[in-house]
Each structure stands twice: as structure tokens, then as C-alpha cells.
């Protein structure tokens, strides 16, 4: 790899967008009516070899907003116990959770010479919908994420590994997946991030991404000289 900085590689790889993996656990399927109960995030960076790797992690238990609906079927699916003393002690408001997350995201955007973050998620439209609804409820003016574009690992996994379920896609990629920790926003975000990196790096190793090809051509010319 020639002397191209990590920040430059990241900013050029995704057209100035910094990919940030988001996972949410909720009280249902309606982002405007149902509660946002957990949010997890994994930021990404590049190593000196140009490989995409997981970086900082963030997770928060969230107190349901006033008037929020919580379906019992959703709690049964996620295993979240709203009456858990540990959860009640740790839970914060949507505003506080997003404020802390966005502070970390903005810092990472700046350090990677990017202009904005882009949400990466497994079935990304679901996570994006709940994130945008929470941003609207909290009247957050400076949203670091692109408001509608996203990168979906369910679709990418179908292309790369022939799987769309997160656990099965991880298995196909050789990534350990603990079913007991599934549907924890922090864990799912970290596993999704590892899966996304696997797909992007595999594509690069197979000869994709224009910057990689340019770098290889430059290295070849330098060797000839």
C-alpha cells in the first residue's frame, strides 16, 4: 500500500460517507408509535492495509418515550424485561442516548475526513425508520446520518453468501454468532459490523474498489522504476 492515509482511504471508499452500524430493539414495528428500547452502534475504520475493521462501540438501554406502545410479543421476541432493576437503573432518555451517540459519530466523521455518516444495518430500513423517528421526537437539528440512504447487510449477505438471516450469514462468513446474545442491540450491531467488514474486504480482495486498483497500478509502476 502506498502512502495513502487511513482517513483518505475511508473517505474515498464510501464517497465521503462514514459507515456506522446501527441496531435497534423496539416495542413493535411502528417507529412513530412503538418504543425504542435499545440502540447499539459500531463505528468502523480502516487499518494500514486498507482492510475495513470494527472500531468504537456504543450501546444504551432507552426509557420508552411518553405514550409509547410496547407490544408483549416484541418483549417476548427480544427478551427485554422493562421491569428489570438493572435495566431501570441503566436506561436513559432517547435524547440522552442519541446525544452521546451522535457526539461519537461526529468525532469519527471528522477524524476520517468524511462529510457525513451512513447507516449500515441488517434490514437497514427498520433501524433507519426508528432512528429517524427518535431524531424527530427529540427535535435534533444536526443529524450526522444521511436521512434516507443506508447500506443493508441482509441484501449484501444474499449477494456474498446466499443468506439473509444475520446468524446464518455470519455462519456462512465464518463469524461466530451466539444465539443467547442475539437481539441485544450492542451485540447485534457488533456482529453486523463484523459481517459488513467481511463482505467489503472480500470484495476488495477479489479485485473490487477503484482506489485499490489505482494503488496496485502505482505500486507496479514504482517497482518498474
Which residues make up each language-model segment?
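Conserved non-catalytic scaffold segment of RNase H-like nuclease domains
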Residues: 2-122, 225
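Acidic active-site catalytic centers that drive phospho-/nucleotidyl reactions
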Residues: 23-25, 127, 152, 188
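Active-site-proximal helix-loop-helix substrate-binding element of RNase H-like nuclease domains
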Residues: 62-78, 82-85, 153-189
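Acidic, Mg2+-coordinating catalytic module of metal-dependent nucleases/exonucleases
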Residues: 118-125, 129-130, 134-135, 167-225
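Catalytic phosphate/metal-binding cores of nucleic-acid and nucleotide-processing enzymes, i.e., regions
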Residues: 141, 160-162, 215-219
Amino acid at each position: 500500500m502506498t502512502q495513502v492515509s487511513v482517513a483518505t482511504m475511508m473517505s474515498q471508499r464510501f464517497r465521503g460517507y462514514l459507515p456506522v452500524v446501527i441496531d435497534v430493539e423496539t416495542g413493535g414495528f411502528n417507529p412513530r408509535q412503538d418504543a425504542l428500547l435499545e440502540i447499539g452502534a459500531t463505528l468502523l475504520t480502516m487499518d494500514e492495509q486498507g482492510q475495513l475493521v470494527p472500531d468504537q462501540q456504543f450501546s444504551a438501554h432507552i426509557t420508552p418515550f411518553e405514550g409509547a406502545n410496547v407490544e408483549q410479543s416484541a418483549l417476548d421476541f427480544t427478551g427485554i424485561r422493562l421491569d428489570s432493576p438493572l435495566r431501570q437503573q441503566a436506561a436513559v432518555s432517547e435524547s440522552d442516548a442519541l446525544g452521546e451517540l451522535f457526539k461519537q459519530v461526529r468525532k469519527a466523521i471528522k477524524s476520517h475526513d468524511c462529510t457525513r455518516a451512513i447507516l449500515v444495518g441488517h434490514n437497514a430500513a427498520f433501524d433507519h425508520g426508528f432512528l429517524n423517528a427518535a431524531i424527530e421526537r427529540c427535535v435534533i437539528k444536526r443529524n450526522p446520518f444521511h436521512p434516507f440512504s443506508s447500506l443493508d447487510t441482509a441484501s449484501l449477505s444474499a449477494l456474498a453468501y446466499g443468506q439473509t438471516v444475520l446468524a446464518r450469514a455470519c455462519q456462512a462468513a465464518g463469524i461466530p454468532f451466539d444465539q443467547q446474545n442475539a437481539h441485544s442491540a450492542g451485540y447485534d450491531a457488533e456482529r453486523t459490523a463484523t459481517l459488513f467488514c467481511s463482505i467489503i474486504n472480500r470484495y476488495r480482495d477479489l479485485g473490487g474498489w477503484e482506489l485499490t486498483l489505482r494503488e496496485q497500478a502505482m505500486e507496479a509502476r514504482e517497482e518498474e522504476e
